[in-house]
């Protein structure tokens, strides 16, 4: 299992660019048309040929420390042996085979019954490279609001065409099944087949978005997150979480915290208590970079979903500044935006207002809800551009975070342009914990 790089796919598509520069930042006038993206049909991703063939294979980190992997797949029949994963050390001749036995389940949703969902955890894996975690470089890609449209396909193609990156962090809104009548669960199956060419070979980790809730009282489906929780397992118990909707993992020199925008988070709630304890566990001499994933953005200058993350921001932002979180990735808004390092935690006694101010101990907030979903682009930014916004564009695309060492990382966002990705935004990042200094593009 490689921990040498960490890459980050954020999602976008567009044409030629013009930039409007203000004291606030850059608003790119390069915008993709806002009409909904055309969704690929169910027939685009048929079940694989062969008797009881496994499908929708995906892998995710299986513990907090990175020494385990969860292998997940779906099969139409639950036969003997169909729940076993055989594995061995890559450098061996295969004679030291080991088996991992999967848990098996199936779920019903309205008039749909899933195939047999298997999740097997393989443990005691070796790090590659086997060197100090704090010195490891890392590339992670981030997606959000992907769906399964032709625009989504371009985003995934561009990501897979880039040789960098060994992991994906997905910031919510996967299949968009609930955009269809009765939350058509077949769209969960087609989505699993769609992303399998990547998700079966590189570990994906997920945050849950609003489209994972799948709450439909009109058809008596009142268990939130039922399809998502059954299909996508995460190692939440390894970080002492009580829910798969919030958890943490360590990957090379990075500590990654996943939060839930759609679960209770106020004082005395399980998520609040867990995060308070979790931040105390972060050892910056071991994992120098601290990254948070949350679906609804806290800083967003788009009219779509404006201020939806405000109550969560008020609850947790002081902790993020105190603990010098480096980056917060969000989705939800179907556009791209990067903030400056700002905080809004101090009350102004003069005018009674609380406004964002420059703060070198604060995170950069990046919205990457631009994966290519069926609903199209959110192309209505507020005017003028607020002072906290550094760059924004109404397009689809992907991004790459290259963590070079314990103090420096390079971030790029690539808009989709026809059959290639073009770098539209970039910045060198300096670790908040060691170098709380101004950063440059």
UniProtKB/Swiss-Prot annotation:
User: Which EC number applies?
Assistant: 3.1.3.2
Q: What class of enzyme is it?
A: hydrolase
Question: Where can this protein be found?
Answer: Secreted
In this chain, Fe cation is annotated as bound at 145, 173, 176, 334
Q: Which residues form the signal peptide?
A: 1-24
| Residue numbers binding substrate | 210, 332-334
Keywords of this entry: Glycoprotein, Hydrolase, Iron, Metal-binding, Secreted, Signal, Zinc
Q: Single GO molecular-function term?
A: acid phosphatase activity
PANTHER family hit by this protein: ACID PHOSPHATASE RELATED, PURPLE ACID PHOSPHATASE 11-RELATED
Q: Per the similarity annotation, which family is this?
A: Belongs to the metallophosphoesterase superfamily. Purple acid phosphatase family.
Protein name listed in UniProt: Purple acid phosphatase 11
Species this protein is from:
Arabidopsis thaliana
Q: What is the lineage of its organism?
A: Eukaryota, Viridiplantae, Streptophyta, Embryophyta, Tracheophyta
The UniProt gene name for this protein comes to PAP11
């Amino acid at each position: 299992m490689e921990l040498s790089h960490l890459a980050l796919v954020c999602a976008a598509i567009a044409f030629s660019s013009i930039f409007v520069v203000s004291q606030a930042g850059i608003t790119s006038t390069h915008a993709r048309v806002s009409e909904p993206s055309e969704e690929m049909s169910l027939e685009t991703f048929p079940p694989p040929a062969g008797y009881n063939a496994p499908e929708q294979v995906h892998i995710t980190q299986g513990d907090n420390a990175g020494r385990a992997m969860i292998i997940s797949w779906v099969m139409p029949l639950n036969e003997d042996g169909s729940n076993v994963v055989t594995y061995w050390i890559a450098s061996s001749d295969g004679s030291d085979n080991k088996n991992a036995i999967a848990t098996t389940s199936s779920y019903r949703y309205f008039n749909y019954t899933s195939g047999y969902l298997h999740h097997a955890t393989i443990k005691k894996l070796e790090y590659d490279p086997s060197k100090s975690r704090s010195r490891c470089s890392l590339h992670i890609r981030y997606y959000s609001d992907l769906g399964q449209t032709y625009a989504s396909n371009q985003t995934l193609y561009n990501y897979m065409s880039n040789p960098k990156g060994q992991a994906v962090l997905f910031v919510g809104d996967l299949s968009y099944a609930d955009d269809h009548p009765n939350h058509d669960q077949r769209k969960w199956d087609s989505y699993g087949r769609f992303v399998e060419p990547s998700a079966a070979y590189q570990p994906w980790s997920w945050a849950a978005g609003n489209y994972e809730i799948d709450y439909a009282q009109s058809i008596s489906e009142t268990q939130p997150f039922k399809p998502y929780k059954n299909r996508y397992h995460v190692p939440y118990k390894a970080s002492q979480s009580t829910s798969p909707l919030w958890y943490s993992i360590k990957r090379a020199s990075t500590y990654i915290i996943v939060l839930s925008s759609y679960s209770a988070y106020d004082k005395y709630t399980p998520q609040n208590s867990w995060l308070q304890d979790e931040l105390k566990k972060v050892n910056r001499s071991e994992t120098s970079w601290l990254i948070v994933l949350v679906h609804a953005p806290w800083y967003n200058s788009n009219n779509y979903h404006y201020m939806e993350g405000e109550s969560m921001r008020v609850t947790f932002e002081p902790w993020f500044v105190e603990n010098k979180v480096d980056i917060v990735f969000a989705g939800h808004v179907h556009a791209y935006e990067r903030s400056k390092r700002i905080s809004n935690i101090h009350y102004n006694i003069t005018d009674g207002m609380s406004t964002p101010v420059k703060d070198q101990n604060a995170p950069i907030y990046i919205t990457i809800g631009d994966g290519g979903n069926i609903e199209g682009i959110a192309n209505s930014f507020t005017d003028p551009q607020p002072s906290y916004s550094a760059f924004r564009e109404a397009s689809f695309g992907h991004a790459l975070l290259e963590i070079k060492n314990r103090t420096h990382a390079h971030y790029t966002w690539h808009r989709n342009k026809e059959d290639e990705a073009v770098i539209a935004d970039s910045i060198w990042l300096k670790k908040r914990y060691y170098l709380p200094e101004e950063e440059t593009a």
